[in-house]
Every structure is written in structure tokens, then in C-alpha cells.
A protein has these predicted regions:
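Hydrophobic alpha-helical transmembrane segments of membrane proteins
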Residues: 1-90, 99-290
Length: 290
């Protein structure tokens, strides 16, 4: 079979297994570091005896979501971490697998793999928390619960746009579309760091963040110099068009259009990342921009 033409899940599994085995020590240190971050959150909120049980779980859920969001973005920029040296690039590029299989392997590692690692690391921190609880005297009842299960359950419920609360059932469709739109924007933001990780060498996270900040500043400066003092009646045609088509031109339509646009941007970033990956060389040019 020609490995340059056909996608094979068996080869993909072998590439992922090889990547995991060769980097087991780095993965272990990463896992322990993430566990320590979650353990610090547990210990911090164990000293807080005020507030209700719901507040206690909400605080943990907020901290878990913040840590997870940062880690997923950071490790997205580390997509090509296993190809930073000439020896690593030679070893990875010479694997008997297609470029797509190698790219998908790394993509799964920094997305699904990292999320699973975060879940397990937070679970380990929960186990350690329970192990140290006997050393604390007279702990309130709100601390004697499985915080890991309740906190992650709340996060998943909040991220699920189809589980609208009772006060949002009046316009549930708009709430669902708004949630999907927000998730699409988050995927687009994540894809920017996937793209940055495939383009930059070292310090991809900081370089990508710096470019995003620079572009935001330039856009803000450009917008500030635009004269928005339009004459009367400039947008009358737009107002009339919206009133004549209000049966379909509503917030649901706008949310759907925005979702589609960001999905296109996300797909383009992933496609461009793959194209950059296929152009990886064992010996990189000496003079390379950034």
C-alpha cells in the first residue's frame, strides 16, 4: 500500500504510541505539574470556610475552567515540540506514515490527549486532598464531598448550550445558538495557537500571543482614526431592509452567520497549519523570519 495516498488508523495508532513512549518522561513531568496546580487550588479553597456549598463548588469550577483553558491554549502552541532539534525532526519525519497521519497524531495529542491528562491530573489532586483531610481538624461538611465530580459536572453543564436553565427557556433557540457561537469562537482562538505552534520554533506561545496583541493594538489604533460621524439618513436603507426582512433577519440568523464565519476561519487555520507541517525539513534554513 502506498503510504503517501491512504490514511491508515493502524499507522496513526503506531505513531501516537511511538510518540508517547519516546516522551514518557516529559509527559510524566507535565502530568505531575498539572496535578500540583490543581492541588494548590484544592488547598487554597480548603482554608476558606465561608460561603455555601454551591459557592464552594462554583469557585472550584471557575478555577478548573481557567486552568484548563490556559493549558489547552498553551499546549496547542507546543504542537511541534517533538521536532525542535534536527535529530527529533529526522526521527519523526522518517516514520513510515503519511504527513496527515503524523499531523493528526500531534493534533490529537495536544487536544484530546491533553484534556484527558488534565482530567486525570485533577483526579489525582482530589485523591491527594482526601489523603490529607484527616490532618485537618473539624472540617465543614462542604469540604467532605467529591469536589472533582461536582466541579467538572458544573463545567460540562455550563458549556452545554442545550441545557438551558428555566429563566432562559423563553428564547431557548437564541441561547443555544449563542452557546454554539461562543464555542466556535473558542475553537478559532485555539486554532491560532495551533497555527503559531506549527510556524514558530521555540517560544511559540509567547510569539503567538505577542502577535495577537500587536494586531489588536493596530486594529484599535486604526479604528480610532475612522470618522464615524455619518450624515443623516446614511443608514436608512439598512434600517428599512432589516424591517422588511425581520421575519428571517433576527438574532438567530446573525448568530448562525457569525458561527459559520468563525468555523471557516478555524478550518483555514488548521489547513494552513497542516501545510506548514508538510513543509517541515530536517535541516531548517539558517535565516528564517521569527
Amino acid at each position: 500500500m502506498n503510504t503517501n495516498r491512504y490514511f491508515s488508523f493502524s499507522r496513526l495508532g503506531l505513531v501516537m504510541k511511538r510518540d508517547f513512549m519516546e516522551n514518557w518522561k516529559t509527559n510524566l513531568y507535565t502530568f505531575l505539574g498539572i496535578s500540583l496546580a490543581f492541588l494548590l487550588v484544592y488547598l487554597l479553597y480548603m482554608n476558606d470556610s465561608n460561603g455555601s456549598s454551591n459557592d464552594f463548588i462554583n469557585d472550584h469550577a471557575g478555577a478548573f475552567a481557567s486552568i484548563t483553558s490556559f493549558l489547552l491554549v498553551y499546549f496547542a502552541s507546543e504542537t511541534m515540540k517533538n521536532m525542535r532539534t534536527k535529530e527529533q525532526r529526522f526521527s519523526y519525519l522518517m516514520l513510515p506514515a503519511t504527513s496527515l497521519e503524523k499531523f493528526v497524531s500531534r493534533a490529537l495529542y495536544v487536544t484530546v490527549g491533553m484534556f484527558v491528562m488534565i482530567l486525570l491530573a485533577s483526579l489525582l489532586a482530589e485523591v491527594v486532598r482526601w489523603a490529607f483531610m484527616p490532618f485537618f481538624d473539624e472540617l465543614p461538611d462542604k469540604l467532605k464531598v467529591c469536589v472533582w465530580l461536582d466541579a467538572w459536572g458544573k463545567i460540562f453543564d455550563d458549556l452545554n448550550p442545550f441545557k438551558a436553565t428555566a429563566k432562559l427557556l423563553v428564547n431557548k433557540n437564541a441561547f443555544v445558538l449563542g452557546g454554539i457561537m461562543g464555542g466556535t469562537v473558542a475553537l478559532w482562538w485555539h486554532s491560532l495557537y495551533i497555527l503559531g505552534g506549527n510556524y514558530f520554533g521555540k517560544y511559540a506561545f509567547f510569539k503567538t500571543t505577542g502577535i495577537i496583541i500587536l494586531v489588536a493594538i493596530l486594529l484599535a489604533m486604526g479604528i480610532s482614526h475612522i470618522d464615524f460621524d455619518f450624515g443623516p439618513g446614511t443608514f436608512e436603507w439598512l434600517d428599512e431592509f432589516m424591517r422588511n426582512n425581520e421575519d428571517w433577519l433576527n438574532e438567530n440568523f446573525v448568530a448562525g452567520v457569525i458561527t459559520f464565519i468563525f468555523l471557516c476561519f478555524t478550518a483555514f487555520n488548521w489547513w494552513l497549519s497542516y501545510k506548514l507541517f508538510t513543509r517541515q525539513q530536517v535541516i531548517k534554513p539558517k535565516f528564517r523570519l521569527l
